Amino acid sequence: MTIPAFHPGELNVYSAPGDVADVSRALRLTGRRVMLVPTMGALHEGHLALVRAAKRVPGSVVVVSIFVNPMQFGAGEDLDAYPRTPDDDLAQLRAEGVEIAFTPTTAAMYPDGLRTTVQPGPLAAELEGGPRPTHFAGVLTVVLKLLQIVRPDRVFFGEKDYQQLVLIRQLVADFNLDVAVVGVPTVREADGLAMSSRNRYLDPAQRAAAVALSAALTAAAHAATAGAQAALDAARAVLDAAPGVAVDYLELRDIGLGPMPLNGSGRLLVAARLGTTRLLDNIAIEIGTFAGTDRPDGYRAILESHWRN
């Protein structure tokens, strides 16, 4: 078997699944640790944070996949309108010192169509899955395929899409996949807005209003010592005051996205529309843990953690 050419220290671009699988296998046999960063392209600093986290692993070789997966787009979602910037994406990967880009076509990823797919658990029908009932089946199917093709030691996802991260961890656990799933904190603009490929669609007024999402989460974190309802009320007050922000949901869950206990660690998630653009955000939050007690030294870190999560 002839292994496709691989040039260390350069960006090697492969479009055939078999080629990247062969190169990954050969690199593992030499002792390199393969890291996978799945993306749909239109790369920004949030994606590059995943790349940098992967590169920090000793002995790593980083594979970044760029594939706009049609299976995760539902009815009424315009697949053709999704931003595609392949030349800019590859230039950014070269600048980061990435050695492998995997850029398959739809025909290469699904040569027999959607013959076999992943059926997610009940969580996939909640939150983001409510208005998008087939979305996470598409996400988990393509992630499983990427993991089988690349066979990485670790795979990296951003915490901004927190429900996706939880479902991928369920996939890996339920199918006994030999890979570690690494969640990387959300990267934010200077004013707190979570970085997203969708931000480019906001007009100036919408961009100014969009900061209400992170501001609402901050307000909730400050109010959380008084309990879950106080946290939700504080967040809702900020969102209600923001012009043009239509909230799809604001929910407090436990860290696995089950029901939130009365006290302890949780996740506060928000989705909202500004015009035709839909934005997501979330933070780690501690509910009632320090109510009626002296606040420990680490309390400020909890309140400030949304800038890193």
Curated annotation (Swiss-Prot):
GO terms for biological process, alphabetical: beta-alanine metabolic process; pantothenate biosynthetic process
Effect annotated for changing H44A: More than 1000-fold reduction in activity and 52-fold decrease in adenylate formation
GO cellular component: cytosol
Binding-site positions, ATP: 40-47, 158-161, 187, 195-198
Residue stretches spanning the membrane: none
ATP-binding found in the keyword field: yes
A GO term, aspect molecular function: magnesium ion binding
Known function: Catalyzes the condensation of pantoate with beta-alanine in an ATP-dependent reaction via a pantoyl-adenylate intermediate.
Protein name in UniProt: Pantothenate synthetase
Taxon lineage: Bacteria, Bacillati, Actinomycetota, Actinomycetes, Mycobacteriales
Name of encoding gene: panC
